[in-house]
Amino acid sequence: MLAEIDREVGARLDAAAQAHPNPWEGFRACCLSYLDLALEPEIQRIVLRDAPAVLGQRFRDLDEAASLGPMIESIRELMEGGYIRTGDIEVLARLVNGAVLEAALWVAAGEDPAQRLPRARSTVEILLDGLRLEARGAGRSDGVAPPRP
């Protein structure tokens, strides 16, 4: 069941990213869309509550296996395209992936997830915007692969 939901989530995140011609905006939309999924009952219960509780570290391992590769590729392409600051690609991918996942887990764990979502979104936006190089890469649309947080 978890694998099936993960595939569906991946497809939805890909669609969110592809809806934007600018790779940076697609990346940002993908990360924020993952947070939005924390309000959907099935995803909230199975992916963000039950799976971490039942699987423990195995949940983290599965998340890394599914999302780290695409996140690394997206970070690499955004750096090469001049959209974000340069740095250690793997470390940055792990940090962004972890931040988005932790924010989604926090949203789902609350008594009122809908109240938590705007707080999580605005904070993740601050984090992502801190990576952005405003003057470089503006207006580009060269098709960076979307990440999967």
Residue locations for each model-derived region?
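Amphipathic alpha-helical packing segments from all-alpha helical-bundle domains
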Residues: E4-A11, L55-G81, E90-R94, P118, ...
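Short, solvent-exposed positions on alpha-helices
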Residues: P21, E25, G87-V91, A114, ...
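C-terminal peripheral helix-coil segments that are non-catalytic and often amphipathic
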Residues: S33-L37, L68-G81, N97-A99, L105-P149
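Amphipathic alpha-helical segments used for helix-helix packing
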Residues: A38-Q57, A109
